[in-house]
Amino acid sequence: MKNKNRGFFRSSLSYAFVILAVIFLIYSFFGRSDGSVKHLSTTTFLKELKNNKIKDFTIQPGDSGVYTIAGDFKKAQKSSSSSSSTTTLLSGYQSSVTKFTAYVLPNNSSLKQITTAAQKAGVAVNPKPAASNFWGSMLTLILPTLIMFALLYWMLIGSQRGQGGSGGPGGIMSFGRSKAKPADPKQNKIRFADVAGEEEEKQELVEVVEFLKDPKKFTKLGARIPKGVLLEGPPGTGKTLLAKAVAGEAKTPFFSISGSDFVEMFVGVGASRVRDLFENAKKSAPSIIFIDEIDAVGRRRGAGMGGGNDEREQTLNQILIEMDGFEGSEGVIVLASTNRSDVLDPALLRSGRFDRKILVGAPDVKGREAILRVHAKNKPLAADVDLKVIAQQTPGFVGADLENLLNEAALLAARNDEKAVTAADIDEAEDRVIAGPAKKDRKTTQDERETVAYHEAGHAIVGLVLNDAQVVRKVTIVPRGRAGGYALMMPKDERYLMSEKDAKEELAGLMGGRAAEILINHVASSGASNDFQQATQIAREMVTQYGMSDKLGMVQLEGSSNVFVGDPNNPNPPYSQKTSELIDEEVRRLTNEAYKRAVDIIKSHPKQHKAIAEALLKYETLDEAQIRSLFETGEIPSDLVKDSQRPARPLSYEESKAALKKNGAVDNKEAEDELKRTKMIRKMKMIPSRVPIQLQKRRQPRRLQLLDAVNNKFD
C-alpha cells in the first residue's frame, strides 16, 4: 500500500511539472517582450518627436481599440526603471535602448496632432493594419476540445485497467461493479472460540461450515445445504462476528458488503452490482457472501411512498433471481444480517432463498460472562474483579455493550494512572453506560437533595418488599446525564416470561418514588415523569398484548406491529374508538392500583425508608448489600460475600459440534418418549390426535424478553 501511494504521488508530481512547463512555453511564445524597448507616454512621445529625436515609427490599431506606436530613436537612449521586471531578470540590466513604444487613444485630435508633428520633423509614419491573433484564436477553439477528448480517453483506459474507486482509474466507469471486499481466508483469524455467548447459534451454523469443508458428505445423501442463512437480532449481538467466524472455520473466501452499497444515483447500478458480486463468488467457490443490514435493499416491494423505489426494487429482484438461480452444489452460501426482519420482502424469506433463520438474541448470564472473558483477555484486571458478578449485574446487555463496558473501565483506570482495572472502575463504567457520566459539580439545594433521596428510597423500599421477581441492585442520588438520581432494579434470574404478578410488582416499584414524595413532602415533583412513562408502557402492554385485563379479554390489540411506514397492511390503530377509551381506563386503573400499593408499603416501613434516605444523603450511592442491610438491621456492612464457581467460556468449533450431536440425541429421545406417551393416551381415548405439546414448543424460537435495566431515572 505504501508503494502504491508513493507511485501515485510521483506520477502526480510529474504531471504537475509537465503542465507548468507547457504554461511557461505558452506564456513565452505569446507574451514575451523585447528587453531593448522603452515605453513612452503620449506627452513624452510628442515631445521627443518635436525635438527631432525620433527616426521613424509605425501606428497600428490594437485589440482593445488603443493605437500602438512603435519606432526607433535616432540615438540610443538610457533605459528607465519602468522596464519589465521579467525582462530584467531574464536579460540582465540594459544600459541603453534604441526602440520605443507608446499608446494613443483612438480620437481624431490625437492622431492629427501626431501626424502634424511628424510632418514638421520630417519623420516617416508607417501605418499598419490591426494584427490578427491567429494562434491565440486557434488555441482558444482547440484546447477545450482536446481536454474533453483527453478526459474521455483517460476514463476508458482506466476502466479497462480494472476496478477502482471513484477517485482512481476506472472509478467513474465502475459503478456497475460490486463493492464487496473479498477477505483472504488466511488473514481471517476469527474462529468459533472467539464468539462467546452464542453457543446455540454456533451449533446451527456447524452444518454450514461442514458443507463448505466437505460438500460431498451432504450431496451424496441427497441433502441440500441452505442457500441462505438470515441472522436476525437486535444491534450489537454479534451477527457480523458470527458470519466472520463461519468463514474463518471453513477457510473459504468471504465477500462482505452492506445493503446500502448496492443502490446508487444511476439506474441499473444495483442490479449490475448484484450480478457482479455473485459472479465473483462463484469463481471463488466454495465461498460466503455476507450482506450486512439487508433490510436497506430487501424491504417489501410496492410499499414505498412517492414511487422512488424502482431502483431498489430492481436490485431486490436481481438478488431474488441470483439466490434462486444457482445450485447448492456450486458452494456459494449467502449470509445476511438484519434487525428489521419484519420489513423484509416475503419472497426473500421463502424456502429456497433464506432457508434458515437464526435468532441472535441477547446472551444469558453464562453468555455474558463468556463475552466478558473474551474482551478481558488484553486488559489487566485487579484481584477484586469478578466477571461472574459483573455478568449477573448486566442483564439485557449484548456483546457490544459488554465490550463498551470494559473499554470504559479501562479508560477510567488509565485516567487514574492505575496499573490494572479495578472493580470500582467497572462499577463506575456501568453507571456511565446506563445513565451517563456523573455530574458531581452540579449545584443543588438541600431541599432538592432530600427530595431526590426520599424519592429513590421509596423505589428501594417497594423493591425490597416486592422482591419475588426483582432485586434492588443500586440506588444513587448522584446526577448522571439528565437524571438527578436513579434506582437500578435487576431480575433475580434470567426471565423468559413475565407473569401478571411480576408486572404488577414492577408497576408498584415504579410508583414508589411519587408515593414517597407525597407522604414526606406532601407535594408532587417532576422527578417521576420517567417513572410514569415506563409504568404506562408496561400497563398498556398488559392490556393490549398480554391479555391481563378482564374487561378487554384475552386479545392482542397492538402487539409487535409492522412499523414500516409505507405498508398498506398496517392500519393504525386496529381497534375502535370505544376500545381505545376502554384501554385508557384499564391502564389508568392498573397504575392507580400500583400507586396505592406503593403508598401502603412505604407507610408500613417508615423507619427503613428514613434510614435509606439518610444514608443516601450521607454516602450518595448504596449497593445491593448495603441497602438490604439497612432495611433489615439499620447498619451498613463492611464487606460482601462472593460466589465462586467454574468460570464460563465460549465453546470452540469442535465443542459446538459435539454439543449439537448431544443435544440432537437428547431431543430425539425426548421426542420418542413423548410420542409413546401420546400414543398410550390416544389408545385410552383421553385426548384427540395432535402433535405433542413439547414438540410444538421446541419448534418455536426462544425469545428473551427483558425490560429496561434502569427502571427509574429521576429527571
From Swiss-Prot:
Membrane-spanning parts: 11-31, 138-158
Cofactor binding comment, as recorded: Binds 1 zinc ion per subunit.
GO cellular component labels: plasma membrane
GO biological process: protein catabolic process; proteolysis
Protein's cellular compartments: Cell membrane
GO molecular function per UniProt: ATP binding; ATP hydrolysis activity; ATP-dependent peptidase activity; metalloendopeptidase activity; zinc ion binding
Record topological domains on the Cytoplasmic side: 1-10, 159-715
Identification of the protein by name: ATP-dependent zinc metalloprotease FtsH
